[in-house]
Amino acid sequence: MADSRDPASDQMKHWKEQRAAQKADVLTTGAGNPVGDKLNVITVGPRGPLLVQDVVFTDEMAHFDRERIPERVVHAKGAGAFGYFEVTHDITKYSKAKVFEHIGKKTPIAVRFSTVAGESGSADTVRDPRGFAVKFYTEDGNWDLVGNNTPIFFIRDPLLFPSFIHSQKRNPQTHLKDPDMVWDFWSLRPESLHQVSFLFSDRGIPDGHRHMNGYGSHTFKLVNANGEAVYCKFHYKTDQGIKNLSVEDAARLSQEDPDYGIRDLFNAIATEKYPSWTFYIQVMTFNQAETFPFNPFDLTKVWPHKDYPLIPVGKLVLNRNPVNYFAEVEQIAFDPSNMPPGIEASPDKMLQGRLFAYPDTHRHRLGPNYLHIPVNCPYRARVANYQRDGPMCMQDNQGGAPNYYPNSFGAPEQQPSALEHSTQCSGEVQRFNTASDDNVTQVRAFYVNVLNEEQRKRLCENIAGHLKDAQIFIQKKAVKNFTEVHPDYGSRIQALLDKYNAEKPKNAIHTFVQSGSHLAAREKANL
């Protein structure tokens, strides 16, 4: 019904209403030349060929041919919004970062939510981790906290990342999603058990983007004004409450409204129901890290809250929708290596790998000057360096300033106060195999202590419902891993698989076929 349309559906109506007092703009080419006729090409006579001189046509088509840019290799489907971060608690004893400077300070932010494995046209309601990336526009440059909706990940070594993503994408020959690929990789890498268990729990399908938590996931380092450092983890917990979709509702929405998450976020902000998240940190001293029972930089594990409680910091609030999706969401580029003074990287191997991979893929997808794009530009800091030229240089290229360092002409100077915190590091240089690290203790705690009986039942049903489509030998490897977590975990999944495997395949697809003679008669009638 027209009178029940939501703000997202009425976007063009609202755009027109906002411009009601204005005359329509003059239609132009990309170069600003007025266009006299946008409906008809120039031809020799009404039936003749086109003329090369029809620059209105060539301008239009040449741009159309180049509208698409490379899709993100992961996190292709996403929604974005803008707002602010406000400090509510003092953590300057941990970090000198200006974003945390004083209680009440507000910093502009941009946020992008996303699924991971699907293409840009895929459904928002699939079972998949969600990206939750936050860009803080600070006076010391941008800080990009490129997180997910889970505090852990599938792997702990970045060398495995391309293979992991390949296993979640499409088969290189059939171009179909392949359960053999997915479960073969997971079953061969038992460090994935923690994230797999989280993924197939109720939280594996969040109800849109507003009702899920976010996590920096990695271990980071905070440095205060005295040069003292601690390790930390970032958490941002939804103020809307956790809500998840049932398998049935998710499947229905994937057909009826595959952009459900984008629509829900847009409409909430458009109706001034601004979503917010409370921002926390966990802190671990260097001495605590030395005596920690496992590697504190292992991305497949969490820091227990009873030992490292959440410390409140502030609020993330989203109060503006994108003005243009391509300009502000498709082109936004998050980079974990964007860290202002007071926030630094830890030895977390996965974080170290991302420090290179993210800016590298942005230079491929958006070009070497992607930081000139307005949504990526650190507009609250003055950029002054010795980088010049390159495709799509959209600013003044730093004018006549020297492009070499050192120099004697008063060009930008290094700032000792921005030096990274010094750390000691020693050990043999080699490739360390961490596959046999403890992969089950925290998963067992999640299964036994975090989930209740109904949640455990749904977890096992969800896993078996997906694993059943993999080959039997892969099923056995996966069940062996789940059994090592807890015998009940493995036995429940195996019992469900036995039931699936005993059933004969059913063809549930109903088709409607027209006879050849009927089609021939229709064709003859159209002559």
Curated annotation (Swiss-Prot):
InterPro entries: Catalase, Catalase_3, Catalase_AS, Catalase_clade1/3, Catalase_core, Catalase_haem_BS, Catalase_immune_responsive, Catalase_sf. The modification N-acetylalanine is found at residue 2. It catalyses: 2 H2O2 = O2 + 2 H2O. Keywords: Acetylation, Heme, Hydrogen peroxide, Iron, Metal-binding, Mitogen, NADP, Oxidoreductase, Peroxidase, Peroxisome, Phosphoprotein. Its cofactor is heme; NADP(+). Heme binds at residue 358. The modification Phosphothreonine is found at residue 511. GO terms for cellular component: catalase complex; mitochondrion; peroxisomal matrix; peroxisomal membrane. Belongs to the catalase family. This is Catalase. It comes from Pongo abelii (Sumatran orangutan).
